[in-house]
Amino acid sequence: MDASTLEALKILRKADVPVMLTLAPEMVPGDTIRQIVDMGVVVSAGHTNGTTAEAKAGLDAGISCFTHLYNAMPPMTSREPGVVGTAIGSDAFVGIIVDGHHVTWEMVGIAWRARPKRDRMFLVSDAMSTIGGPDHFELYGEQIEVRDGALVNAAGSLAGAHIDMVGCLANLVQQVGVPLEEAIRAACVVPADVMGRAAPNLGSGTPLPELLALDKDLKRISL
């Protein structure tokens, strides 16, 4: 975590811009994490090789969220819960990609049911430019393309997701079996809670562009 990053965070927060920062807790000292949290930045653990102890130390320092559970973090084992197990067992917010490629339906369900507070789970699309655009793009010099519904590089490794939030919502209900009301909260309300923002409030006068209408099969319909 260099000085220029800290300065950028200060500038954004001084302008009252909501900021979430994903970091690897084993790479950033606890005092620095506390400093960032004190700025009003939401700090999330992710893209990490951290151990259980390092993940817990990050929580103690003020980390309040985990980025796309299971992905870009070591797998949980019977002797080393790691970041995954720490996230599931914590009261922190946890995001998860529900596209069937990043995480199997069964593993989504296990995490969802195991959380001590299920209203701390939220959906992440991890969508890339193929949603509404061409089926390929370049990222860090690599060609990324849609293959069998997944976004992959030439080696077949995942590189973002080819799904939007409505698709994640439908999968959570239809494939994982989460109740619709709970799934809607995970898509619309909990993300606002993560950032400390007011939850969406639908009512008379709500601008049409802020609304989505879905049919009984959770497919988007025109308003």
Region roles according to the model:
Residues K14-D16, P25-R34, D38-V41:
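Acidic, metal/ion-coordinating pockets
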Residues I184-D193, S204-L208:
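Small/polar glycine-rich anion-binding or flexible loop at a beta-alpha turn
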Residues A198-L223:
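C-terminal cap of metal-dependent C-N hydrolases
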Residues M1-K14:
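Conserved phosphate-binding/catalytic loop of the ribokinase/pfkB sugar-kinase fold
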Residues M27, N49-G50, A187:
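Short beta->alpha linker loops
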Residues L12-D16, L59-D60:
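Acidic (Asp/Glu)-rich catalytic clusters
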Residues T32-I36, V42-A45, G50, E54-E182, ...:
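Active-site-adjacent C-terminal substructures of enzyme catalytic domains
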